[in-house]
A protein has these predicted regions:
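N-terminal regulatory/effector-sensing and dimerization cores
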Residues: 11-12, 19-121
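Conserved small/polar residues in nucleotide/adenosyl-binding loops
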Residues: 283-290
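Basic, amphipathic alpha-helical hairpins
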Residues: 142-152, 163-174, 189-202, 221, ...
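N-terminal positioning helix adjacent to the helix-turn-helix/winged-helix DNA-binding module
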Residues: 181-189, 225, 234-237
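Short, low-complexity, intrinsically disordered N-terminal peptides in bacterial proteins
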Residues: 1-20, 285
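Amphipathic alpha-helical segments enriched in hydrophobic/aromatic residues interleaved with Lys/Arg
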Residues: 115-178, 191
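Basic/polar phosphate-binding segments, predominantly the helix-turn-helix DNA-binding elements
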Residues: 194, 199-236, 243-246, 255-280
Length: 294
């Protein structure tokens, strides 16, 4: 996911007793966003990220939907979502604790190239969204914990790269090229929503771009992406809002610039998709770069 900003960081959302969600960034990975959370009731609305989502379940079970499948992620599982994979999430069997990171395509390709020596390698693809791998889970969890605590930047940096290499070497197909770059009618509609997310687009705009009738467009769009055109537009707006928050813009200004009616609308959409709200809080960045500021 796109990271948070100093002065306009993403603060913890109001959760039920015993729940928490903490979003932080790893400075040594150019602001790589990380999440540590425990949920017993909170559910995520369907959403997508510009980045991968790679993480592990520490305890409990998460029920989620992705790639047209109903999935269960349990203790010791590794979880993989590709960029723009639409997914949701809900507690199952009493709730769950998990750690998650949101690496860019460039970072995952960098690790894949170091494993294979092939600089022409495509976008790493994980055939299974969830795999049982206690050893890989422990490796990832320890690196994530070190990054969160911020005590030893080099250890966290090395550990996370080792964890990503483990995931790629054991669970990824490195021969797949250009995930999500199809050029069909739905791709054309998605491109318009990505480009003009701050406008009040109509179905007529999307039909002109895609060449599909309105009723066909809605059904086909949902079948291919998992979201209706409107839900996809809101998701794009949230992703672009996070980019602006990272640059230090205020939530009110960000809401106006990204097509939301007001800050309250932004907050509701943000919370539903990401588990945290945009708010004024002191950002904690992990790594030597930011520790030197204190």
């Amino acid at each position: 996911m796109d990271p948070i900003s100093q002065g306009d960081a993403l603060q913890e959302m109001p959760l039920r007793e015993g729940e928490h969600a903490r979003l932080f960034t790893a400075a040594r990975f150019s602001g790589l966003e990380c999440l540590s959370a425990r949920f017993s009731t909170h559910t995520y609305s369907p959403h997508a990220h510009d980045t991968y989502a790679v993480g592990t379940i520490l305890s409990g079970c998460e029920l989620w939907h992705a790639r047209g499948r109903t999935l269960f992620a349990r203790t010791g599982d590794l979880v993989f979502n590709h960029p723009l994979d639409v997914h949701d999430g809900a507690p199952s069997e009493g709730g769950y604790r998990y750690r998650m990171t949101y690496p860019t395509i460039e970072l995952m390709r960098e690790v894949a190239i170091s494993l294979t020596g092939d600089e022409t390698i495509g976008t790493p693809f994980f055939p299974e969204p969830t795999v049982q791998d206690p050893e890989g889970s422990a490796l990832f969890s320890e690196a994530h914990r070190v990054l969160e605590e911020g005590g030893d930047g080099l250890a966290g940096e090395e550990g996370l790269l080792r964890a990503y290499a483990w995931c790629l070497s054991r669970h990824a197909d490195l021969s797949v090229r250009d995930i999500g770059r199809e050029r069909g009618p739905i791709a054309q509609a998605r491109e318009l929503l990505e480009q003009r997310y701050d406008e009040d687009l109509s179905l007529a705009d999307l039909t002109r771009r895609s060449g599909l009738p309105r009723h066909h467009l809605i059904r086909a769009f949902r079948r291919e992406t998992g979201l209706t055109p409107h839900a996809y537009l809101v998701d794009v707006r949230v992703r672009r809002a996070r980019e602006r928050l990272r640059r230090g813009e205020s939530p009110g200004a960000v809401a106006a610039a990204t097509g939301f009616c007001d800050q309250a609308h932004l907050t509701r959409a943000f919370k539903a998709r990401l588990g945290v709200t945009p708010g004024r809080s002191e950002e904690r960045r992990v790594g030597k770069e930011c520790r030197s500021r204190w």
